[in-house]
Amino acid sequence: MTKSELIERIVTHQGLLSSKDVELAIKTMLEQMSQCLATGDRIEIRGFGSFSLHYRAPRVGRNPKTGQSVSLDGKFVPHFKPGKELRDRVNEDEEEGF
């Protein structure tokens, strides 16, 4: 699902807000979440999951075109851990023949 599909689905299901209002709310939420992670904070949405940063240590990689070794610096990457309610719901849908 893309961001525009999400906006359309929310507008269709709730019917009270315009697509511009929903789009602004989603953009604002995503921007705030990005800023929070950029400062190293953790985001927890109960019942859904948590977002945090995981550190990837420096390593030696390989250029797929040339096969040449390349030194890759260490970096932080965003990580999502689903909450129990989300995991249960996904598994419930799977059992029903998703």
UniProtKB/Swiss-Prot annotation:
Q: So what family is this one in?
A: Belongs to the bacterial histone-like protein family.
**Which gene is this protein's source?**
ihfB
Q: Which GO terms describe its biological process?
A: DNA recombination; regulation of DNA-templated transcription; regulation of translation
Name the SMART domains for this protein. BHL (SM00411)
Q: What is this protein called?
A: Integration host factor subunit beta
The yes or no answer to whether the keyword DNA-binding is present is: yes
Subunit: Heterodimer of an alpha and a beta chain.
Its domain of life reads Bacteria
Gene Ontology terms: cellular component? chromosome; cytosol
Write out the transmembrane intervals.
none
Pfam families per the UniProt record, alphabetical: Bac_DNA_binding
Which UniProt key words apply to this protein? Answer: DNA recombination, DNA-binding, Transcription, Transcription regulation, Translation regulation
Q: Which GO terms describe its molecular function?
A: DNA binding; structural constituent of chromatin
Q: What does this protein do?
A: This protein is one of the two subunits of integration host factor, a specific DNA-binding protein that functions in genetic recombination as well as in transcriptional and translational control.
NCBIfam families, A to Z: hip, PRK00199.1
**Xref: Gene3D superfamilies:** IHF-like DNA-binding proteins
